[in-house]
Amino acid sequence: MFCTTFILVCLVGFLRPKPMNSKASGAFFWNNKVNDTNKYNFIISGDSRTYRGVSPDEIENIIENTKAKNLGFSSGGFNEEAFNLINKYLDLDNNNNIVVIGLTPFSLTNSAYDSGHLRSIKKKNIGFESWKINNLTKGLVFFDPIIPSEIAARYFGYGYYHKYYDNGWVESEKYPINRDVALKLYTKQFANNKFSEKSFQVLLDNIYDLTNKNVKVFTLRMPVYYRLKALEDSLSGFNENIIKSKIISNGGLWLNIQDSLYSTYDGSHLDGESARLLSVKIAKKIKSHLMNE
């Protein structure tokens, strides 16, 4: 009886559709961002546009001898805590360290500077909690429940899909696609939350410090829906030309990205295919720079 039940459970586990957003996978994913014991020579930092938009696998496939990690967090900003995490994972014994910073207008606001998501993950996932996630929760992915509403969503062609990768990337898709949904959200966000000189100065100081450690720092503005980009430029106080100039004067390098080559599902975040395309473009631009040094 037990064997029959076990076999049936395994069959259901293998044959059933995967959850749209596995809670067990998500728990391990975020814990691994702050409690990974490995070192890397390629770090990607930013907010949700970055952790959904840049795949370390594509980077590693193009730039030889690279071990990459995406350290993006929801609504992530650039404070000392974020850079402490970057420095924690960098392999400073390696002379080929690279940091890619994915900028968004929101990432340089006071709200993003607080980095509430990063801080909450670090505060929560310590000691036994971290051990439990790594050793128990991860094993429960196989048994993640599928709720009835997800079955209906798949049938009618809607839903928000997340695929978590141990390297820090989340491949995301959302149906139906609605790029205009971000316009109202960011109009509200920037009503009382503008570009922060303090946050930008911390970013510049850390770019300068990293370059003095022989780390190459590349920055880019993450691509978005053209109407959202125009809205952000008009409301946020983010001046791309000034930001680019100051980053370069502090030792950083700027990657120009053509927004129209990439598509979003909600105006703000790249779909999986576009995230891979962007990652390949970033890797090729960086590789070209390294070869021409």
Give short role names for the model-derived ranges.
Residues 45, 49-134:
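Membrane-embedded segments
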Residues 1-16:
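Hydrophobic membrane-insertion alpha-helices, especially the h-region
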Residues 103, 112-213:
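Secreted/periplasmic serine-hydrolase-like ester/acetyl group-modifying domain
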Residues 15-38:
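Alpha-helical transmembrane signal-anchor/signal-peptide segments
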Residues 234-293:
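Long, positively charged, glycine-interspersed low-complexity recognition regions
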Residues 41-42, 98, 218:
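Structural motif
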Residues 204-218, 246-253:
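A structural motif corresponding to the C-terminal end of an alpha-helix
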